[in-house]
Amino acid sequence: MQKNVVSNLFVDLPKHADQEWFTSLLEKPHCRIERIVSYGQSSPDGFWYDQAQDEWVLLMSGEAELDVDGESVKRLPGDHLMIKAGTKHRVVRTSADVPTVWLAVHC
């Protein structure tokens, strides 16, 4: 039997990384929960996520702007968004001066 795990999503954040950091918190056959940490990153020009699973994201710190099917969506801490499977989306910008911390659930 596995033990319960207690942790904090704001502990051990990478320091001003030049790339986004993805930390898997839970993986099951049809569900994945991850912490994403960004410092000013954005999706490469012309790149779009188009995922087979729904994705729910919660912005916990920093600010972000997404493009979801051609619509600009600005996010502040506490904002969350459900992105349905097959919806093209990309990250336009994230805060560069503070960590932008996301919690993402893929199901």
Functional labels for PLM-detected ranges:
Residues 63-65, 72, 88:
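Structural motif
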Residues 50-66:
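Short, conserved beta-strand element in jelly-roll/cupin
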Residues 70-85:
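Short acidic-glycine-tyrosine-enriched beta hairpin
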Residues 30, 53, 99-100:
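A structure-centric signal for secondary-structure junctions around beta-strands
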Residues 86-107:
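Ligand-binding loop in jelly-roll beta-barrel domains
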Residues 1-35, 39-40, 45-46:
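A short, N-terminal "cap"/entry segment at the start of jelly-roll beta-barrel domains
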